[in-house]
Amino acid sequence: MEVVILAAGQGKRMRSVLPKVLQPLAGKPMLSHVLDAARTLAARRICVVYGHGGEVVRERLDAADLAWARQEPQLGTGHAVQQALPHLTDGDLALVLYGDVPLIGVPTLQRLAAAAGDTRLALLTVELDNPTGYGRILRDAAGRVVRIVEEKDASDAERRVREVNTGILVAPVARLRAWLGSLRNDNAQGEYYLTDIIGMAVAEDIEVVTVQPDAVSETLGVNSKPQLAELERIHQRNIAQRLMEDGVTLIDPARIDVRGELVCGRDVEIDVNCVFEGRVELGDGVRIGANCVVRDARIGSGTRVAPFSHIEQTVMGPACVIGPYARTRPGTELGEDVHLGNFVEVKNSVIAAHSKANHLAYVGDADVGQRVNIGAGTITCNYDGANKFRTVIEDDVFIGSDTQLVAPVRVGRGATLGAGTTLTKDAPPEQLTVSRAKQLSIAGWKRPVKQR
């Protein structure tokens, strides 16, 4: 099977300079969702028909498995599919999808293709309580589809029909090529309607069959920001439902956003207003507190992430305790039972098992050993204004509060750094290292008085 994706719409109602099919849904362009469905079907060829802002679309999403066809000017859906014909092979089937219908499901498309077989024209239709704006499916007395009439061309009786065309169809490429070559634009819009091929199929005694989607939401298109927001909520509810069916506890399934892939072990609990981006893996028994953002991370079993923490491109071992208000940045690796408390930031660092930085610290470009205690206010000074340098802290080190480690520097195994130390040279193992100005008490000193 070959797939044609129509993605040339202008999207004026979006009121955006970004082409409509690039508007984000669940963290990626709408068109990407449709491409994912086509790829899951193992389509032999995928052709994207682009128009408005097309070069931007192509630059953003171009890939080796995609063909591109430009529609200029834009003269309707039939004209759009015509532009893809040079990329299609007679003897195969063509599936027509839409770049602004992002929730179409693969099982639905598989049933549609099966219904088409090798010779039939298969249409995806839905029944709506309010079919305003959609082309109506017209059937004869025997229930056979005879044609589709667009709403602007429909009579009052035809407008009362509730079964509507979604635009998604499967047809033999050879027949599609012939039908499209016979299209006329003598209609209210002066456009070449793809739907007119149904009448041609009926006239040629080609069987026209219909399939209903698993959910109406699969066929909903997006023309405005409110509609985009509606589909976002539908999509997130579907994700939340699947997570709960897999055993994840969601404190409120209406308040989670997954903008990528979330893989969870057993007995995972996620509190409200959490956002997961990219690929995130949560081990057994992981608990994520409220208002956390987790991006491209792997979190080990039994780890607890307290509220308002941000985790990005991080690997965490089991039984860690993170937050609240902690931040791990790209390149962070945490061993077992690592504690990062409130207002601790870690970047591009490896922290080994059982080490702790419980509050108010910055650990950047560092290698931290096991059982290290990092006191409040500790900073690894890793940047000299031009280059980054690493800090090495060996096992069993105790770092007092308000300590600065000016990289490159090494703290030996079992060393203790006194509070307030500014370390500019390596600290030897098993020794106390302190660098402080001598404490003075000045007798008779008085605070300045504000002049009147």
UniProtKB/Swiss-Prot annotation:
It catalyses: alpha-D-glucosamine 1-phosphate + acetyl-CoA = N-acetyl-alpha-D-glucosamine 1-phosphate + CoA + H(+); N-acetyl-alpha-D-glucosamine 1-phosphate + UTP + H(+) = UDP-N-acetyl-alpha-D-glucosamine + diphosphate. It is an enzyme of class 2 (transferase). Keywords: Acyltransferase, Cell shape, Cell wall biogenesis/degradation, Cytoplasm, Magnesium, Metal-binding, Multifunctional enzyme, Nucleotidyltransferase, Peptidoglycan synthesis, Repeat, Transferase. CDD domains: GT2_GlmU_N_bac (cd02540), LbH_GlmU_C (cd03353). Residues 247-452 are annotated as: N-acetyltransferase. InterPro entries: Bifunctional_GlmU (IPR005882), GlmU-like (IPR050065), GlmU_C_LbH (IPR038009), Hexapep (IPR001451), MobA-like_NTP_Trfase (IPR025877), Nucleotide-diphossugar_trans (IPR029044), Trimer_LpxA-like_sf (IPR011004). Pfam families: Hexapep, NTP_transf_3. Residues 1-225 are annotated as: Pyrophosphorylase. Homotrimer. HAMAP family: GlmU (MF_01631). This is Bifunctional protein GlmU. It comes from Azoarcus sp. (strain BH72). The lineage of its organism: Bacteria, Pseudomonadati, Pseudomonadota, Betaproteobacteria, Rhodocyclales. The gene is glmU.
